[in-house]
Amino acid sequence: MAGPELLLDSNIRLWVVLPIVIITFFVGMIRHYVSILLQSDKKLTQEQVSDSQVLIRSRVLRENGKYIPKQSFLTRKYYFNNPEDGFFKKTKRKVVPPSPMTDPTMLTDMMKGNVTNVLPMILIGGWINMTFSGFVTTKVPFPLTLRFKPMLQQGIELLTLDASWVSSASWYFLNVFGLRSIYSLILGQDNAADQSRMMQEQMTGAAMAMPADTNKAFKTEWEALELTDHQWALDDVEEELMARDLHFEGMFKKELQTSIF
């Protein structure tokens, strides 16, 4: 037989639940704009810009080569894929993996990420845990097992309390992960307010990801262009155009009436 239902004071909703939601939301908004202010522009070399433009030209040739004559297509393809001195064959780039110990820019970016992501979470989480400790804020609308008690009832040591109830400290962490859709709606998909995404990137090492290997990109594009054949898309376009009923008489009458009035 189930025990009596726990009745919460309505002041908890006004002075605990809503303040935690509002504080978490505005901290995320401030983090987004602070990250924009601290964001450093990544400097690209002339070689990187040139390589990216070459890859774009090759991709455009594969996609739209059917709209140029076959000789023009083969000439451009020969420039990229010539087995002897083609661009993708003769061009070799030296890829140097970045090292945080030798690159001050990476160290600065890591420090900025810690300042805008880790430090606010520690400070705000500690302040909320100290200010609103010991409160039961809400209850999830479905039953949970006892394994969820350490996650949803931080700061409350009640063995008899149902695992569906959420403490104030756990309510803060639920808001950190639950406001992602609100941030995406207000700030756009790629925003710095989503603290959970920042944490995942730091844990998976996405923030220190290796740069793309230009040589592999050239090889992939060479293979894709090598498999592309020219298929003339404008074959018999003159006959098709002449066979259509273009209704020139109606167009001329409309222009004549417009000029009269």
Curated annotation (Swiss-Prot):
Cytoplasmic side: 39-114, 188-261
Ranges of the Lumenal topological domain: 2-14, 131-168
Disulfide cysteine pairs (residue numbers): none
InterPro entries, per database record: EMC3 (IPR008568), EMC3/TMCO1 (IPR002809)
Classification via SMART domains: DUF106
Gene Ontology terms: cellular component: EMC complex; endoplasmic reticulum membrane; membrane
Mode of membrane association: Multi-pass membrane protein
MF (Gene Ontology): membrane insertase activity
Main localization (coarse): endoplasmic reticulum
Segments traversing the membrane: 15-38, 115-130, 169-187
Gene Ontology biological-process entries: protein insertion into ER membrane by stop-transfer membrane-anchor sequence; tail-anchored membrane protein insertion into ER membrane
Role description: Part of the endoplasmic reticulum membrane protein complex (EMC) that enables the energy-independent insertion into endoplasmic reticulum membranes of newly synthesized membrane proteins. Preferentially accommodates proteins with transmembrane domains that are weakly hydrophobic or contain destabilizing features such as charged and aromatic residues. Involved in the cotranslational insertion of multi-pass membrane proteins in which stop-transfer membrane-anchor sequences become ER membrane spanning helices.
Description of how the protein assembles with itself and partners: Component of the ER membrane protein complex (EMC).
Name recorded for this polypeptide: ER membrane protein complex subunit 3
